[in-house]
Amino acid sequence: AFFNRGGGYVGICAGSYLAAANYSWSLGISNHKTFCETIDLPDIGRKSMWYRGPSATVKMELTKAGREILGDRNGVFQVRYQNGPIMSPMGVKGLGAFRTLAIFRSEVVRYGPQKGTLVNTPAIIAGEYGKGRVLSISPHPESSAQLYSLVANGIRWAGRR
């Protein structure tokens, strides 16, 4: 009912996992899945590939659609990352495709098999659910004063303000 009345959702980091469509516990309001494999690593044991260690800085770049919605910030810039989701299309029928608003341009790696799985993937995506809007943000732009306007613009977009 909330989305059918035009409600908006903004999920940052864990909120993007929650919006996804690939978990039994997720809301399924965004047509994305998250990279959540667990593998056995020799001499280390079974490890979750989403875990990349403590908070770190990565590089991110807005797409043309991202600059239109989040603000006209050109080029690559730094953002805090702390194990946010690696998002890709889920392909759920009846759920519209998402638009990529920002792309990761670097990555954090804790285990060898993680190399290459974050860089050049969507960092921020936007979609619609019912008559509402969904914004999923993997990193933490809200933790940097220089990026407050990006978050504020995203909230305004989701709320149709």
Predicted segment positions?
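Extracellular ligand-binding/catalytic regions of CAZymes and related secreted enzymes
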Residues: A1, A21, S26-G28, K33-C36, ...
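A glycine-rich, often tryptophan-bearing local segment used as a flexible ligand/cofactor-contacting loop or short
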Residues: A1-N74
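Catalytic beta-strand/loop cores that center a nucleophilic Ser/Cys/Thr
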Residues: W50-R133, S138-E142
